[in-house]
Amino acid sequence: MKISSGAINFSTIPNQVKKLITSIREHTKNGLTSKITSVKNTHTSLNEKFKTGKDSPIEFALPQKIKDFFQPKDKNTLNKTLITVKNIKDTNNAGKKNISAEDVSKMNAAFMRKHIANQTCDYNYRMTGAAPLPGGVSVSANNRPTVSEGRTPPVSPSLSLQATSSPSSPADWAKKLTDAVLRQKAGEALTAADRDFSNADFRNITFSKILPPSFMERDGDIIKGFNFSNSKFTYSDISHLHFDECRFTYSTLSDVVCSNTKFSNSDMNEVFLQYSITTQQQPSFIDTTLKNTLIRHKANLSGVILNEPDNSSPPSVSGGGNFIRLGDIWLQMPLLWTENAVDGFLNHEHNNGKSILMTIDSLPDKYSQEKVQAMEDLVKSLRGGRLTEACIRPVESSLVSVLAHPPYTQSALISEWLGPVQERFFAHQCQTYNDVPLPAPDTYYQQRILPVLLDSFDRNSAAMTTHSGLFNQVILHCMTGVDCTDGTRQKAAALYEQYLAHPAVSPHIHNGLFGNYDGSPDWTTRAADNFLLLSSQDSDTAMMLSTDTLLTMLNPTPDTAWDNFYLLRAGENVSTAQISPVELFRHDFPVFLAAFNQQATQRRFGELIDIILSTEEHGELNQQFLAATNQKHSTVKLIDDASVSRLATIFDPLLPEGKLSPAHYQHILSAYHLTDATPQKQAETLFCLSTAFARYSSSAIFGTEHDSPPALRGYAEALMQKAWELSPAIFPSSEQFTEWSDRFHGLHGAFTCTSVVADSMQRHARKYFPSVLSSILPLAWA
């Protein structure tokens, strides 16, 4: 019989114990019996030496070092050690013929180290509460250093040499794991026994509280090679940890928080894995097996290794449950398809991208057969649930985002069931997004929804013209989406060719303006006018615009130009100068109306009109001034004598000596919340208001090429003068200021065209304080 006690790390044992063991090893080489006698009933001798009582059973002849090592108060420790030594002797005698002297020495040394450590540490903790010192040393009541069992674990057990008992509580298990993990982190080579945490109990343990932060960091420390089989992790929190080459077989991970937990190269077979709803980020499984493991319906299985399923029965869970197979994994299903179950299991668009659909689809393509089989089982379950259209409606988008793509389109069962669902989804998209912009398409939308919409338009080509607002948006996002595939772009371009060939569309593209100017789209540049939207009211009217213009009008900024398009009637370009953008959008192209109105509400020029022309006294003029801001050109002119006189009556009191009256100036500051603003901020606002009144006085609005209302020119110049007084720095130069002032009044031979002045001032404001200009200037004038 060959017995090996394994290697002993003497570097972790205090010097006194080293000397003790060395002495014992020397004695055991000589047969041990020369120094240790058999048991005698010498009660008196022991009484005298240790005061232990009449029945002490042992007399010994150990080296003086052992006697000196223990004090009388350590008598129990000493007795246990002596019994151990006797056992060593008996074992030596029994196996003397089959055990080499070297093995005897190793075995005796291991026993001595083990028991001295156990008993002395036990004495320290139970009698004195002494804490271990660094390196595994503690101090006993007699101030003698001892080996701490908690700091220097025994070597790998062989045969019956292991005497360590399992921890009795989750806290003890956590402490043991912390010790082992830290030793591994320090570079110590752990034995299989060191890494054996089978049948452990980690219930309610938050691992971030027992491990250093480095284990929770991205690409941080790893828990590697541990055996957690048949262990309990119920209600524990293992978030952000990385377990590599670990075994969790038959373990219970019920209501465990495992946000962003990584399992790699691990065995998680036969595990009950239902992580807590507080898990915010899904755990990941990389090259990990999950045979017969119960998985929640919101898991990511992209790195799982599937194998052939066996004939095992579904797992039993409290409250019962339905299950489907995904390869050799069990996926939990609801008992009944209630409204809550439909939302919770199927609606990943409402549940942070998590659903049973996404769980199945997360497997690699090499498991296509298993994925299709699982989806077919899911569809059978849904079909058996006899769900109404109203119940399915909230999850139609989620369903088609997965099932309308390969490999599931290869299944006749899935395609037959999904067909009506996809038709209803498409009808809802047409109804909702023909007149309003689609949400900004993210990666999910570009890769999962846009291809479905293309497929639906392909099946229902009439919808391309009846819902050209939606169709053009879909093509736009397919051609510009950075996450769209080449296949998606090619299909979008092919569908648009069909659209351009439609009789309602083709008359508008052969005018030398469309695309590459010959009637074909030019997808090589976003500046080409490739898009053509049909009017929702008049089939003879269309809007032609470029990719960039369409994008900015659907998602505008304060600087968006709302007239950078061609308006076509019967294929001919018509002027939009006297067309109100808001009326054009409301009547013909409602897809832009909401965005335009939203930007218009941020323009505050009308507040000054209400100050000057109150609706109570000047209701008609108030409406004329506001209506003029909705178009680039006005047919109403205010240059006749009656109009000039009326305007002078209104504006002259505001401009004593040609300057803003203090009271009127304060009204302006109050209306635009500038009372406490800096002089520069006040000046920028007055400058922009001046550009607007310069526009009023020009031939584009209330003036003509040869005449303009003097009151409006004078008011525009007074606003500019006040801006100069407040902050000359906002002007290009004093010379430019003087030139603009002269143009307002025709002084010093200056050309009096206020349209030129308005354009020049507007360009300057857009360059140096665009946000102020965008908050004031009417959209139609921008």
From Swiss-Prot:
The active site is at 753 (glycyl thioester intermediate). It is found in: Secreted; Host cell. Keywords: Secreted, Transferase, Ubl conjugation, Ubl conjugation pathway, Virulence. It catalyses: S-ubiquitinyl-[E2 ubiquitin-conjugating enzyme]-L-cysteine + [acceptor protein]-L-lysine = [E2 ubiquitin-conjugating enzyme]-L-cysteine + N(6)-ubiquitinyl-[acceptor protein]-L-lysine. Ubiquitinated in the presence of host E1 ubiquitin-activating enzyme, E2 ubiquitin-conjugating enzyme and ubiquitin. Its EC number is 2.3.2.26. Residues 157-171 have a biased composition (Low complexity). GO terms for molecular function: ubiquitin-protein transferase activity. Gene3D superfamilies: E3 ubiquitin-protein ligase SopA, effector protein (NleL), HECT-like ubiquitin ligase, Putative secreted effector protein. One of its GO terms (biological process) is protein ubiquitination. Residues 136-171 are annotated as: Disordered. GO terms for cellular component: extracellular region; host cell. Belongs to the SopA E3 ligase family. Effector proteins function to alter host cell physiology and promote bacterial survival in host tissues. This protein is an E3 ubiquitin ligase that interferes with host's ubiquitination pathway. For instance, prevents host innate immune response by ubiquitinating and thus sending to degradation host E3 ubiquitin ligases TRIM56 and TRIM65. This is E3 ubiquitin-protein ligase SopA. It comes from Salmonella typhimurium (strain D23580).
